[in-house]
Amino acid sequence: MKFLYLHGLGQKPDSWDRVIKETKVSDSSVCLSLAEMLEDKAATYGELYAAFSGECDKEHDEIVLCGLSLGAVLALNYAIDHPDKIKALVLIAAQYKMPKKLLKFQNMLFRFMPNATFKQFGFKKADVISLCGTMAELDFRDSLCKVSCPVLIVCGEKDNANKKASKELAGYLSDSHFYELLKAGHEANIESPEELATVLQEFYNSVE
């Protein structure tokens, strides 16, 4: 099995380093870069998803996808489109229907932030605003029934923006389990890497 990790917007691939180090599958783990996948492409969700799909399609082994925030959206999307390729799915701080008001507010904040903030994560400010704008219409509700693999849904106790949706998602997916990380916020992979790694490894053990 190959374990593919997807970070969130505002993170880099190394956001997963401490988590992966604590698991027993580090040798089979790869952290993908959202910025690299969008390099020389239009900054849209469609382009990002196409590039991510291409990375997954290269794998000949069964895949376990683990994504946080935007990474979770991409992972869920791929599991819907390619259920035969996915052995298991981990969705952290996930949304299955994009919260338009939240995205709009987020984009408004982005406009006031300096370019340097985005550059440290490999993005241009305009590209982040464009990318988030193209996600507003995403809605997977009618397609969730296509997900056939075991799913672990994780959300930080303090991640109020995503907890409700994460719990709802666990209810919609037939073979899923919800886990709340105590004292953690949105960036669970950075805030609670050891606890998250323990939860992930228990899940991985159950699907191997």
Functional labels for PLM-detected ranges:
Residues 8-11, 69:
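Active-site glycine-rich loops that stabilize anionic/oxyanionic intermediates
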Residues 10-18:
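Serine-hydrolase catalytic-loop signature spanning alpha/beta hydrolases and amidase-signature enzymes
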Residues 146-147, 153-155:
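Short beta-strand/loop motif that positions the catalytic acidic residue
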